[in-house]
Swiss-Prot record:
It is found in: Cell membrane. It is a multi-pass membrane protein. A motif (NPA 1) lies at residues 78-80. Its main location: membrane. This is Aquaporin-1.
Length: 271
């Protein structure tokens, strides 16, 4: 663990997570907030249409940033994804902790900037996740679990280095998965499926009502996705010793921007 801490590529990856998360939150929530402004020419905007726009904003921003920094950090951009890859023994405990901190700080910074830019917006919630009227915490938890499960399952499948049948773009597939999660959950919980995204809005608005739902749900969903993929759908043969080695020291094969160890396939490869 100490050896990974001393590597430049490790800190590049942490910085990449912070910067990408800041851009992701600013672009996606900024796009969602824009739909609250009055529509010009006396036109009205339907809720269903707005949901599609918001879903696409989140999905496309993830796809774009995953393509941009995936070769540097793996582009997790989500503590639930980071937890999933940790439980799947693809990253070390140290990397997981530092990534989650970077993601949360990035979300807070982006939301704070948005707060200043959109301060005149009436009823500005800064994308705060909250349970819709009639939705209790248990139902919201279930929605967050399912929405995150399909996302982390997609990440595990599209970044599985054992596969030889992968075609197309992994970042785009993951972006569509994020959009799909929003289409499912946005009317029930505002769609968290990303604890850091929810945390940034809660911190800046000082509103933590039912906030636990947006941490517990995604983490359960991410853990279930690992259980389903790694132990049922595509079992891994790694023994306990190998798994512990990854948790303490990280993956043996890493993408190095200095060219020390560059693998042939690097697209969205988790570090």
């Amino acid at each position: 663990m100490a050896s990974e801490f001393k590597k430049k590529i490790f800190w590049r990856a942490v910085v990449a997570e912070f910067l990408a998360m800041t851009l992701f939150i600013f672009i996606s929530i900024g796009s969602a907030l824009g739909f609250q402004y009055p529509v010009r020419n006396n036109q009205t905007s339907g809720a269903a249409q707005d949901n599609v726009k918001v879903s696409l904003a989140f999905g496309l921003s993830i796809a774009t940033l995953a393509q941009s920094v995936g070769h540097i950090s793996g582009a997790h951009l989500n503590p639930a994804v980071t937890l999933g890859l940790l439980l799947s023994c693809q990253i070390s405990v140290l990397r997981a902790v530092m990534y989650i901190i970077a993601q949360c700080v990035g979300a807070i910074v982006a939301t704070a900037i948005l707060s200043g830019i959109t301060s005149s917006l009436p009823g500005n919630s800064l994308g705060l996740n909250s349970l819709a009227p009639g939705v209790d915490s248990g139902q919201g938890l279930g929605i967050e679990i399912i929405g995150t499960l399909q996302l982390v399952l997609c990440v595990l499948a599209t970044t599985d280095r054992r596969r030889r049948d992968l075609g197309g773009s992994a970042p785009l597939a993951i972006g569509f998965s994020v959009a799909l999660g929003h289409l499912l959950a946005i009317d029930y919980t505002g769609c968290g499926i990303n604890p850091a995204r929810s945390f940034g809005s809660a911190v800046i608005t000082h509103n933590f009502q039912d906030h636990w739902v947006f941490w517990v749900g995604p983490f359960i969903g991410g853990a279930l996705a690992v259980l389903i993929y790694d132990f049922i759908l595509a079992p891994r043969s790694s023994d306990l010793t190998d798994r512990v080695k990854v948790w303490t020291s990280g993956q043996v094969e890493e993408y190095d921007l200095d060219g020390d160890d560059i693998n042939s396939r690097v697209e969205m490869k988790p570090k």
